[in-house]
């Protein structure tokens, strides 16, 4: 029980920092004026009246490229701390990082072979 005593400040900070945005959200909902009408339902384009329909369909290719970007961006986030402490960690961690990169490369080659990355 004495070990948890050191984390009291952390838990208090976590609870307070979680409650403040929730309280602000609910307070703004209660204090904000409620006005319903056709102007509230229209889309806003920098003060200009919208022309045409505001809903556009994006091609699935955009999402595939975004997904591949996110995967390799997260890979960079994981590999950067490893690269900074490579001399301390040793060879076993190098092998683990190599396996991690190889798994991602296999996934990239699979997506490439399936044609998921072709723009046509």
Curated annotation (Swiss-Prot):
Cell compartment(s), UniProt: Plastid, Chloroplast thylakoid membrane
Residues spanning the membrane: 9-29, 64-84, 88-108
Catalytic activity: a plastoquinone + NADH + (n+1) H(+)(in) = a plastoquinol + NAD(+) + n H(+)(out); a plastoquinone + NADPH + (n+1) H(+)(in) = a plastoquinol + NADP(+) + n H(+)(out)
Organism from which the protein derives: Lactuca sativa
Family statement drawn from the similarity comment of this UniProt entry: Belongs to the complex I subunit 3 family.
Disulfides per UniProt: none
Gene: ndhC
Keywords: Chloroplast, Membrane, NAD, NADP, Plastid, Plastoquinone, Quinone, Thylakoid, Translocase, Transmembrane, Transmembrane helix, Transport
Protein name per its UniProtKB record: NAD(P)H-quinone oxidoreductase subunit 3, chloroplastic
Subunit structure of this chain's protein: NDH is composed of at least 16 different subunits, 5 of which are encoded in the nucleus.
Gene Ontology molecular-function annotations: NADH dehydrogenase (ubiquinone) activity; quinone binding
Any one Gene Ontology cellular component term annotated for this protein: chloroplast thylakoid membrane
Chief place of localization: plastid
A Pfam family of this chain: Oxidored_q4
Gene Ontology biological-process annotations: photosynthesis, light reaction
Membrane topology label: Multi-pass membrane protein
This enzyme's EC code(s): 7.1.1.-
Role this protein plays: NDH shuttles electrons from NAD(P)H:plastoquinone, via FMN and iron-sulfur (Fe-S) centers, to quinones in the photosynthetic chain and possibly in a chloroplast respiratory chain. The immediate electron acceptor for the enzyme in this species is believed to be plastoquinone. Couples the redox reaction to proton translocation, and thus conserves the redox energy in a proton gradient.
């Amino acid at each position: 029980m004495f070990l948890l005593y050191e984390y009291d400040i952390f838990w208090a900070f976590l609870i307070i920092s979680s409650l403040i945005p929730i309280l602000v959200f609910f307070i703004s909902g209660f204090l904000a004026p409620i006005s319903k009408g056709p102007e509230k339902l229209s889309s806003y384009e920098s003060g200009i009246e919208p022309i045409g329909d505001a809903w556009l369909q994006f091609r699935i290719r955009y999402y595939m490229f975004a997904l591949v970007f996110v995967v390799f961006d997260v890979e960079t986030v994981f590999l950067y701390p490893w690269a900074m402490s490579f001399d301390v960690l040793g060879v076993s961690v190098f092998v683990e990082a190599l396996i991690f990169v190889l798994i991602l490369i296999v996934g990239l080659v699979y997506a490439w072979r399936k044609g998921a990355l072709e723009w046509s």
